[in-house]
Amino acid sequence: MRKKIGILTSGGDCPGLNCVIRAVVSHATLTYDWEVFGIPYATQGLLERQAIALNMHGWDLRGIDPLLNMGGTILGTINKGDTLAHVDEMLASYEALALDALIVIGGDGSLGILHELASRGNWNLVAIPKTIDSDVALTERAVGFDTAVNTIVDALNRLTFTAASHDRVMIVEVMGRSAGHLALHAGIAGGADVILIPEISYTISGLCQYIAELRDRWQRKFAIVVVAEGAKLCLEDVQENIASACVSPKCGRGQYIAEQIARCSKNLIDTRVSVLGHIQRGGIPSALDRLTATVFGKTAVDLVAQGKFGQMVAWQNGEAIPVPIQDVVAQSPLHVNPQGSLVQSARCLGIYVGEKT
């Protein structure tokens, strides 16, 4: 009897998800002659017992070829709602679908929820990491991160010239509430002067002094500041009320920093803020994300064939390997190492990356 496996995408979208789907459908069909069913809109589709045959409905082996360069996910996804409030219904729905295994593509949050459901229902689960934040533990790669970095670098390339033309400080706010990998990688690669991330606190005085030094010592009248949305002020600044109402995470970090630079310079420094927002989640997947997604999808199918469940496909030392999902969940989110090579390299290049401890 042919195996029947399901696949779903969960959490925020990112480039490369369709590449994973393409690899799973191709390998499962060509190599193992299995049936592959897509679960639309993650746990919502699971709850509603929806399953789309991915070797039919236009997504057969010929139909999945365009997925290689498509952003987003053809299956749809959700990143809201209290899934664990419907555990019993979810478990019953999974049983009704009669799947031999389920391949899930998600970030640290959605993987934790799906692992919990799988543990309660004894599901045959295999996971694939995707995140533009690169904060999933135990893997050196995750689908979507490389494209997001390239998207930010492209924006920095464009904004640098307009900043230089007007002698402005250009502040670029990027995603990263709890981990600063995206800001750090893109900031270094994009030639930023300042990179502010959640893991290393900064001071307004230190930031303003650095920008003043660029102007006075190096005759640089423009600057590029990359700030993660979760960048944190030093505790002393918060306690002294320097941050005012903008200490709240609801206040945009980029706008707050622009206001503080204007205050410190007595409005002599012209600032502009660009919040990249969901542009970072879109776009055509990079070559590296396509390769990562393809290898991850193929490996996930092989793990199902080998009966190795409760595993996430990870990239370590140049190879795709299985690691226990429970270990990934326990160690996520993965934070930037403040003493790591990237932070040290940034500082050696003269980039302000917050205060040294």
Curated annotation (Swiss-Prot):
Annotated positions for site Important for substrate specificity: G109
Gene3D superfamilies, A to Z: 3.40.50.450, Phosphofructokinase domain (3.40.50.460)
Enzyme class: transferase
UniProt-listed InterPro entries: ATP_PFK, ATP_PFK_prok-type, Phosphofructokinase_CS, Phosphofructokinase_dom, Phosphofructokinase_III, PKF_sf
Superkingdom assignment: Bacteria
Classification via PROSITE patterns: PHOSPHOFRUCTOKINASE
Localization: Cytoplasm
Reactions performed catalytically: beta-D-fructose 6-phosphate + ATP = beta-D-fructose 1,6-bisphosphate + ADP + H(+)
Catalytic residues as annotated in Swiss-Prot or TrEMBL: D133
Disulphide bond pairs: none
Listed GO MF terms: 6-phosphofructokinase activity; AMP binding; ATP binding; diphosphate-fructose-6-phosphate 1-phosphotransferase activity; fructose-6-phosphate binding; identical protein binding; metal ion binding; monosaccharide binding
UniProt-annotated binding residues for ATP: G12, K80, G81, G107, D108, G109, S110
Cofactor(s) demanded: Mg(2+)
The UniProt record lists the keyword Manganese: no
Activity regulation field: Subject to allosteric activation by ADP and other diphosphonucleosides, and inhibition by phosphoenolpyruvate.
Enzyme Commission number, as recorded: 2.7.1.11
Residue numbers binding Mg(2+): D108
Keyword DNA-binding listed: no
Keyword annotations: ATP-binding, Cytoplasm, Glycolysis, Kinase, Magnesium, Metal-binding, Nucleotide-binding, Transferase
GO cellular component: 6-phosphofructokinase complex
Protein family according to the UniProt entry: Belongs to the phosphofructokinase type A (PFKA) family. Mixed-substrate PFK group III subfamily.
Subunit organization: Homodimer or homotetramer.
Protein name: ATP-dependent 6-phosphofructokinase
Native source species: Trichormus variabilis (strain ATCC 29413 / PCC 7937)
Gene designation per UniProt: pfkA
